[in-house]
């Protein structure tokens, strides 16, 4: 499968080019979905990794050898075929970047599920690391630097992730030397009509929270910048800065009041006062209330070498260095899945308790 099809050209409308390229790829892939009924013949199902209204994620080992994978199953009675194909196609096209979770093999369908394989993150998701307190400064920097690179990669291909949150950041080692952004289910070409979130979300920017049905806004990279700023705050403090970026949320009102007061008070309101000036400047840019002047994700690198004032700045092993990536490098990954079956329903029930190592929500 051609994996750089979503790159845009210098001529023509970039947003239209990306949308058309993705649509063509979805149509092409639709004829290549493999209908199968013998999952347990091809894979040993180890345990359930996560589940939700979308379906479930399973840890599986190919019976003929190869890497352990996370199998994402989407219920056919609740997910449109085109939605499934779009997520798979986007995942395959951007899998060359180490900051984005690899999508592997071929798309499949059983009588109950659409399915595809992804690389398995053995340390779970970022939310599992934030149960009690924020992370040391070095780890926070590693995380946001890798995510900033991943988002810039997506944005350079005319795509917006639109669902950046701790649950969707997969962790590959305890020191966060590699993390990857997963769940591309809401990823769309830039400019796609986007409504308000169906439920209040702390990661949604105010311009979307203010929308009333049936109004929409064109999807912009600034949505990801805002969510990256919220995620930075979460990684540093183990909590969200607000419940929703909308009045009358008191935490958001305090932040917005400080951001809009002229001249701006020298000291920000709590809990923002725990950040050193370089980190605070970064957060002010990523969380700019005006999406037109909001900083891009790569603004992270402007202050990466500065002191952010976070706890445990001397903790953590190794250097700040993260996995390098050079645009243009391609890596084919994963083995295709050949056989599927709905017999997994009974086998999954016997495979042990649910663990949150990988999430698909």
From Swiss-Prot:
Catalysis: reaction(s): L-seryl-[protein] + ATP = O-phospho-L-seryl-[protein] + ADP + H(+); L-threonyl-[protein] + ATP = O-phospho-L-threonyl-[protein] + ADP + H(+)
Domain named Protein kinase: residues: 43-309
Source organism of the structure: Mus musculus
Enzyme Commission designation: 2.7.11.1
Classification via PANTHER family: PROTEIN KINASE DOMAIN-CONTAINING PROTEIN, SERINE/THREONINE-PROTEIN KINASE SBK1
Pfam families per UniProt: Pkinase (PF00069)
InterPro entries: Kinase-like_dom_sf, Prot_kinase_dom, Protein_kinase_ATP_BS, Ser/Thr_kinase_AS
Region (Disordered): 312-361
Protein family according to the UniProt entry: Belongs to the protein kinase superfamily. Ser/Thr protein kinase family. STKL subfamily.
Protein's UniProt name: Uncharacterized serine/threonine-protein kinase SBK3
UniProt keyword annotation of Zinc present: no
Residues annotated for ATP binding in this entry: 49-57, 72
Catalytic site positions: 163
Comp. bias regions, Basic and acidic residues: 349-361
Keyword terms of this UniProt record: ATP-binding, Kinase, Nucleotide-binding, Serine/threonine-protein kinase, Transferase
Molecular-function annotations in GO: ATP binding; protein serine kinase activity; protein serine/threonine kinase activity
Biased composition (Acidic residues): 328-348
């Amino acid at each position: 499968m051609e994996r750089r099809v979503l790159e845009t050209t210098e001529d023509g409308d970039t947003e239209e080019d990306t949308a058309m390229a993705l649509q063509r790829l979805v149509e092409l892939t639709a004829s290549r979905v493999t209908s199968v009924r013998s999952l347990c013949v091809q894979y040993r199902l180890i345990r359930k990794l996560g589940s939700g209204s979308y379906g479930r994620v399973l840890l599986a080992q190919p019976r003929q050898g190869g890497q352990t994978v996370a199998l994402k199953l989407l219920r056919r009675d609740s997910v449109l075929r085109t939605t499934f194909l779009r997520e798979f196609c986007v995942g395959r096209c951007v899998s060359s970047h180490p900051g984005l979770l690899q999508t592997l093999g071929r798309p499949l369908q059983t009588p109950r599920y659409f399915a595809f394989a992804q690389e398995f993150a053995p340390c779970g998701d970022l939310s599992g690391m934030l149960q009690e307190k924020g992370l040391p400064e070095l780890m926070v920097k590693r995380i946001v630097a890798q995510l900033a690179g991943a988002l810039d990669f997506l944005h350079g291909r005319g795509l917006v992730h639109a669902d950046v949150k701790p649950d969707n950041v997969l962790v590959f080692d305890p020191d966060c030397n590699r993390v990857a952004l997963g769940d591309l289910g809401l990823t769309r070409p830039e400019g796609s009509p986007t409504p308000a979130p169906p439920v209040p979300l702390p990661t949604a920017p105010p311009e979307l929270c203010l929308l009333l049905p049936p109004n929409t806004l064109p999807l912009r990279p600034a949505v990801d910048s805002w969510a990256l700023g919220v995620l930075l705050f979460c990684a540093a403090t183990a909590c969200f800065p607000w419940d929703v970026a909308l009045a009358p949320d008191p935490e958001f009102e305090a932040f917005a009041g400080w951001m809009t007061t002229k001249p701006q008070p020298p000291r920000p309101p709590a809990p923002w006062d725990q950040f050193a000036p370089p980190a605070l400047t970064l957060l002010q840019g990523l969380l700019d209330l005006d999406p037109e002047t909001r900083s891009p994700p790569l603004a992270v690198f402007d202050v990466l070498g500065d002191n952010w004032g976070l706890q445990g700045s001397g903790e953590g092993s190794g250097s700040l260095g993260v996995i390098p990536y050079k645009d243009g490098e391609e890596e084919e990954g994963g083995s295709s899945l050949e056989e599927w079956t709905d017999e997994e329903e009974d086998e999954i029930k016997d495979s042990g308790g649910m663990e949150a190592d990988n999430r698909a929500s």
